[in-house]
């Protein structure tokens, strides 16, 4: 490829990202949510609780298992809210019904019709920013934890014990903390700001822009990082999106690709993982 073609391609991509930034700032961020059910109450004094937030996407079953496992194993007062970024209205209705069933908050996020196809990471990132700035920032929580919709707690966990010697909790992805298991004290976030968008210039996925807020120049070896151990349901298939999951910090199970956005075919995998979760829940009844 000639130098001129590379320059033109680079400029085209730069223009796309600039346009996305403009629309996000002046259009998306100013939109009202499409629907709210018992959303987080804003204002008031800081309380001893953790705001747990999840961006759901086209899968209601994982949301219900996440609620059940958190209520069983999360050993600190928390408020849990589902921020629905689903593109399938039927799935959104199912997720809302589950939230009503379990009496947890639900917010249907604004549409993102301005995003080109293939910008799922950007979609997730601006959804995370929207939920934090609109609902969490002034919600009065002592801690904030952001979860992927297909991650489940499978053993006792106390968020208040994670910050004795450091300011964050989570797994390192590249040069930042993965936003699927991401937690900090609220006063730290409010001091430095937060940005969960991916970064074109850093070649980073969702959450990469937080590098500039928290992690630039950090000596990672001085901090405890959540271990991410890959496990497979069948030895004959090493595709983690179709046949595997991660065990994180010995107490979190991350499914990978639960909504099958990669088109791998995950029905068998998810049924087996749900069976594993049922066993965990029964053992502690």
Question: Language-model segments: which ranges?
Answer:
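N-proximal low-complexity "stem/linker" segments adjacent to membrane-targeting elements
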Residues: 2-68
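Short, acidic, metal-binding catalytic loop of nucleotide-sugar glycosyltransferases
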Residues: 68-78
């Amino acid at each position: 490829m000639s130098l001129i073609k590379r320059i033109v391609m680079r400029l085209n991509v730069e223009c796309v990202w600039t346009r996305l930034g403009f629309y996000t700032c002046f259009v998306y961020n100013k939109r009202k949510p499409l629907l709210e059910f018992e959303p987080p109450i804003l204002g008031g004094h800081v309380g001893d609780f953790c705001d747990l937030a999840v961006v759901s996407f086209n899968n209601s079953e994982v949301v219900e298992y996440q609620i059940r496992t958190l209520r069983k194993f999360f050993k600190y007062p928390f408020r849990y809210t589902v921020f629905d970024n689903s593109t399938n209205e039927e799935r959104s209705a199912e997720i809302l019904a589950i939230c009503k069933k379990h009496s947890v908050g639900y917010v249907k996020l604004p549409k993102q019709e301005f995003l080109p196809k293939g910008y799922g990471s950007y979609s997730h990132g601006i959804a995370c920013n929207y939920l934090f700035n609109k609902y969490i920032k002034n919600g009065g929580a002592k801690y904030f934890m952001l979860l992927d919709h297909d991650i489940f707690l499978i053993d006792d966990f106390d968020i208040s014990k994670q910050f004795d010697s450091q300011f964050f909790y989570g797994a390192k992805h590249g040069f930042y903390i993965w936003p699927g298991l991401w937690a900090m004290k609220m006063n730290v976030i409010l001091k430095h700001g937060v940005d969960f968008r991916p970064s074109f210039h850093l070649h980073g996925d969702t959450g990469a822009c937080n590098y500039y807020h928290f992690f630039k120049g950090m000596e990672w070896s001085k901090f405890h990082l959540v271990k991410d151990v890959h496990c497979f349901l069948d030895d004959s298939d090493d595709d983690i999106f179709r046949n595997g999951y991660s065990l994180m910090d010995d107490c979190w199970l991350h499914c990978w690709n639960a909504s099958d956005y990669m088109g791998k075919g995950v029905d068998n995998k998810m049924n087996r993982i749900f069976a594993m979760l049922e066993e965990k829940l029964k053992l502690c009844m």
